[in-house]
From Swiss-Prot:
CDD domains: TGS_ThrRS (cd01667), ThrRS_anticodon (cd00860), ThrRS_core (cd00771). Its main location: cytoplasm. Catalyzes the attachment of threonine to tRNA(Thr) in a two-step reaction: L-threonine is first activated by ATP to form Thr-AMP and then transferred to the acceptor end of tRNA(Thr). Also edits incorrectly charged L-seryl-tRNA(Thr). Belongs to the class-II aminoacyl-tRNA synthetase family. GO terms for molecular function: ATP binding; catalytic activity, acting on a protein; metal ion binding; threonine-tRNA ligase activity; transferase activity; tRNA binding. GO terms for biological process: threonyl-tRNA aminoacylation. Its cofactor is Zn(2+). This is Threonine--tRNA ligase.
Amino acid sequence: MINITLKDGKVIEVEKGVKVSDIVMKISPALYKKAVGAKINGEIAELMTEIKEDSELEILTFDDEEGRKTVRHTSSHILAQAVKRLYPEAKLAIGPAIDNGFYYDFDIDFTFTPEMLEKIEKEMAKIVKENLEIERFELPREEAIKLVKDASEPYKVELIEDLPEGEVISFYKQGDFVDLCAGPHLPSTGKIKAIKLLSVAGAYWRGDEKNKMLQRIYGTAFLKKSELEAYLKMLEEAKRRDHRKLGKELDLFTINEEGPGFPFFHPKGMVVRNILENFWREKHTKAGYDEIRTPVILNEELWHRSGHWDHYKENMYFTKIDNENFAIKPMNCPGSILVYKSHLHSYKEFPMRLGELGLVHRHELSGALHGLMRVRCFTQDDAHIFMTKEQIKDEILNVIKLIDSFYKVFGFEYFVELSTRPEDSMGSDEDWEVATNGLKNALEGAGLEYKINEGDGAFYGPKIDFHLKDCIGRTWQCGTIQLDFQMPERFDLTYVGQDGEKHRPVMVHRVVFGSIERFIGILIEHFAGAFPTWLAPVQVKVMTITDSQKDYANKVVNDLKEKGIRVEFDDRNEKIGYKIREAQLQKVPYMIILGDKEVSENKVAVRSRKEGDLGAISLKEFVAKLNYEIDNRIVENSK
């Protein structure tokens, strides 16, 4: 007999070699119906896994991220099996679970059409109904290669040949379908009650543009049809809010073929951008930050010294100046470090907070580019803080409070993750432990719940990630706090302590928006282009019913401009109904409609985007209303 410790601390005794599924049934038949996987001693496992020693056991359901991935990973195999049944000539590439769904890449001589997707989806439904048992088996390298060669699957051969010697090579079988896969998977295909194929796109094999273009079928899966219906409804709403569409319609930005991944901000987009940057400066000045600016191009040696060369060079751009190799910076931290090193520092200056709205460039594959959300050049709202070890907790708490104060202004809820040491990290175990505990202590001191994201820290230190939740339930990773003992060591940073001796400072890297461009994209979608008054590129649109009101309208426009209001005058010879509809499409917060009555009474008829017709009021009263919204950064309900 062995002892199994459950997540709630309860210990149960079971027979050695018992399957997880049998333990779940023993715990609760209701839980058995919901269970999709497990964690054994912190490692992801399947319900079919046998436990042979005392272990800690956590049962995973679809409510858990790892549980959803298991369901969707199995769904990708169901997709591949359906395609192979219908189109046996298709060659299989890869098919992982991804955020909110799954995909599978196929090599086939024709393009999948919407009608074909419907046919594939029906075949997938048959496979689910067949409730095929899913079995895992392992093979030695040579036998594994023979299996996939005999099946005429060249991409699988390449994957196996690239595995390190001694690596476990596993396959999963459901009915007559076999696929190379590390898992995990469900016990059978019948557990999945709702699958939907969403789209087809091109994808280069292994993401390399030099390789063959494959066809990628995207889909999603749920255990309940009602959950799938809600998700599809959210996707429709997301299309309506797509920042790429709205960015063009509202004349905010474009991305041109002359510069893929390099956004062009138009005048109205620059208004939004400048407001955000000035807001950032205002908040940071009050919080004790000093702003700096560092060069975009720095020599190659600097990136070797910082460690970015070893960990990041595939994402960097390079150039040559006077026969010397230079790199376009992918991050701002080395420049900030050089500012710190420009003279000697005392502990009395700590914590030293250096902020920078720094332009960085990172090479992204063309297939990964997506409007403002995934670009090749962007502005990071970085700050680097230098401090003593004793100041870690208090300073991280200050940063957490600062980030929280930013997100509250926009009405965002958020959740927090603590990302720990990755495999390709640098530095000692002791430094990583101190850094990780420092972040944990600060999070607990702030009273924030957080999730551990194992192995997803930066190469130089652990980090706290802030994930914003938008009005349709999607999440976006924005703010980050990273604790770093490595850069100060690599650059030999020092300060003079109370004892008069030189000591090594601790460094914090942190962002609030993350990327100005991406944050603007998030705001466009969150507000569906209807920015709150303080952020709107045009706050007021003035329009006349006939030409006889033009002189009065010009006076109103000039008065508003003098008071700092962003106003446009629509003096076109069009019907007033047409002008109103145009302003509504441009999502202007307020319209002023002027007729003879308003001129004679020296008033303005105001129409609000949110509240509708507000009637005729004095310009002074209207400006007071505007200023209240602007000064207090009022945010309307964005739904």
